[in-house]
């Protein structure tokens, strides 16, 4: 993986002795905001979502990993290929194309777990996919970059941020394992922690979105990269949903895989860019990564809003057709989908894909006054 970055220019490895170029001075506050929010989100949100995971269901996912396999195919098959096609289609410069490929080769991020919760996705599958994709990134990131960057040349090999990947793994596994233990020992307290964590995670996403919009005025980014950062996560969501649908996953899993596919780990992408490019190019490339992170949050919030609106509309229509539901003071079901969806998801792992489809089709018509 070596050649020219921009005509006769080169992309030497990042040097700590170089002064930041013009335009980077104002990024300190932005980097600090995203770093702090990411740390809080990874710690608190993953612990709270771990409280929604049952060890038995998690083990079933790992024993028969149909959903995880489809998710990994989307993550390290569709996303790098999409990045390559976007780079070719938009005629990007070599260093810009490499940055887009780095983003497409990254594993899923924590944002996907928050969004999955709010679209009633399969949290066990979501957390399993995030963890497994991070582990797989140790080998798949260099493989994908080796395959797709051969169309361009760099004067120096790209550097995989193995330390950052290790830190990400620890920040995922430890809080989730703690949450699973809390759910096993104190299920009532775990439900409360889950609600608090989901609310905090949602607010953090809003803060990230607002902060990004406010600070985006000073971003120095190529218009083409800005357009790609907007459409790339959308393409990931759509392609992930279609592949999950074509492989006969349940609607719940289709939503989960769709969210997981489009939401990338921005921190790993930034870490790799800092290790692989000089400060001369980091101005545009870091802003591309931040823009992608902003758009994936904005797209995710729109998806959540659309799903919640659809859910309320369906519930309202059902209640109008069944007035007896108005007289039922129903208790709140567990936040992670309804009971019949949980049974359907378990059936998917136990019975196989075809039986699960029949189960899902039957249970999807179960009336509910919730």
Swiss-Prot record:
Name the Gene3D superfamilies on file.
1.20.1530.20
Q: Which InterPro entries match?
A: BilAc:Na_symport/Acr3, Bilac:Na_transpt, Na+/solute_symporter_sf
Reaction catalysis annotation = estrone 3-sulfate(out) + 2 Na(+)(out) = estrone 3-sulfate(in) + 2 Na(+)(in); 17beta-estradiol 3-sulfate(out) + 2 Na(+)(out) = 17beta-estradiol 3-sulfate(in) + 2 Na(+)(in); dehydroepiandrosterone 3-sulfate(out) + 2 Na(+)(out) = dehydroepiandrosterone 3-sulfate(in) + 2 Na(+)(in); androst-5-ene-diol 3-sulfate(out) + 2 Na(+)(out) = androst-5-ene-diol 3-sulfate(in) + 2 Na(+)(in)
Q: How is it modified after translation?
A: Glycosylated.
Please indicate the ranges of residues that lie on the Cytoplasmic side: 54-67, 119-126, 181-195, 246-265, 306-370
Q: Which residues are glycosylated?
A: 8, 14
Principal subcellular localisation of the protein? membrane
A GO CC term assigned to this protein in UniProt: membrane
Q: Where are the annotated segments for Disordered? A: 1-24
Q: Which GO terms describe its molecular function?
A: bile acid:sodium symporter activity; sodium-dependent organic anion transmembrane transporter activity
> Highest taxon of the source?
Eukaryota
Q: Where in the cell is it found?
A: Membrane
Which key words are in the record?
Glycoprotein, Ion transport, Lipid transport, Membrane, Sodium, Sodium transport, Symport, Transmembrane, Transmembrane helix, Transport
How does this protein sit in the membrane?
Multi-pass membrane protein
Stored Pfam families: SBF
Q: In which tissues is it expressed?
A: Highly expressed in heart, lung, spleen and adrenal gland. Moderately expressed in skeletal muscle, testis and small intestine.
- Any further remark recorded for this protein: In humans, 3-beta-sulfooxy-androst-5-en-17-one (DHEAS) is the most abundant circulating steroid sulfate in the human body, it is mainly synthesized from adrenal glands and gonads, whereas rats and mice have low circulating concentrations of DHEAS in the periphery as they can only produce DHEAS in their gonads.
- To which protein family does this belong? Belongs to the bile acid:sodium symporter (BASS) (TC 2.A.28) family.
Its function?
A: Transports sulfoconjugated steroid hormones from the extracellular compartment into the cytosol in a sodium-dependent manner without hydrolysis. Steroid sulfate hormones are commonly considered to be biologically inactive metabolites, that may be activated by steroid sulfatases into free steroids. May play an important role by delivering sulfoconjugated steroids to specific target cells in reproductive organs. May play a role transporting the estriol precursor 16alpha-hydroxydehydroepiandrosterone 3-sulfate (16a-OH-DHEAS) at the fetal blood vessel endothelium.
> What is the protein named?
Sodium-dependent organic anion transporter
Q: Which organism is it from?
A: Rattus norvegicus (Rat)
Originating gene:
Slc10a6
């Amino acid at each position: 993986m070596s050649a020219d970055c921009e005509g006769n220019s080169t992309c030497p490895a990042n040097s700590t002795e170089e002064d930041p170029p013009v335009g980077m001075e104002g990024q300190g506050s932005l980097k600090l905001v995203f770093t702090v929010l990411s740390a809080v989100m990874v710690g608190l949100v993953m612990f709270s979502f771990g409280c929604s995971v049952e060890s038995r269901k998690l083990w079933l996912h790992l024993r028969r990993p149909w959903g995880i396999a489809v998710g990994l195919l989307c993550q390290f098959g569709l996303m790098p290929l999409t990045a390559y096609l976007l780079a070719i289609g938009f005629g990007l410069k070599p260093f810009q194309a490499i940055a887009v490929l780095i983003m497409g080769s990254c594993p899923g991020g924590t944002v996907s777990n928050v969004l999955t919760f709010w679209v009633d996705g399969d949290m066990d599958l979501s957390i399993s996919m995030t963890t497994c994709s991070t582990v797989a990134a140790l080998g798949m990131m260099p493989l994908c970059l080796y395959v797709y960057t051969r169309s361009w040349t760099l004067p120096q090999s790209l550097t995989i941020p193995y330390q950052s990947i290790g830190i990400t793994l620890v920040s995922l596994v430890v809080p989730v394992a703690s949450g699973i233990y809390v759910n096993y020992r104190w299920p009532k307290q775990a439900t409360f922690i889950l609600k608090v964590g989901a609310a905090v995670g949602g607010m953090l996403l809003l803060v990230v979105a607002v902060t990004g919009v406010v600070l985006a005025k000073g971003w120095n980014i190529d218009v083409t990269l800005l357009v790609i950062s907007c459409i790339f996560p959308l393409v990931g969501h759509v392609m992930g949903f279609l592949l999950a649908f074509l492989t006969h996953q349940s609607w719940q899993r289709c939503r989960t895989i769709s969210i997981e596919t489009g939401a990338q780990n921005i921190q790993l992408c930034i870490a790799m860019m800092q290790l692989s490019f000089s400060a001369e190019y980091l101005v545009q490339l870091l802003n591309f990564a931040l823009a992608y992170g902003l758009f994936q949050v904005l797209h995710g919030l729109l998806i959540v809003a659309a799903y919640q609106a659809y859910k309320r509309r369906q519930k309202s229509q059902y209640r109008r057709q069944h007035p007896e539901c108005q007289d039922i003071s129903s208790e709140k079901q567990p936040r992670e989908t309804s009971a019949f969806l949980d049974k359907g998801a378990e059936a998917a792992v136990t019975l196989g894909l075809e039986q699960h489809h029949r189960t899902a089709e039957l249970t999807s018509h179960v009336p509910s006054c919730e």
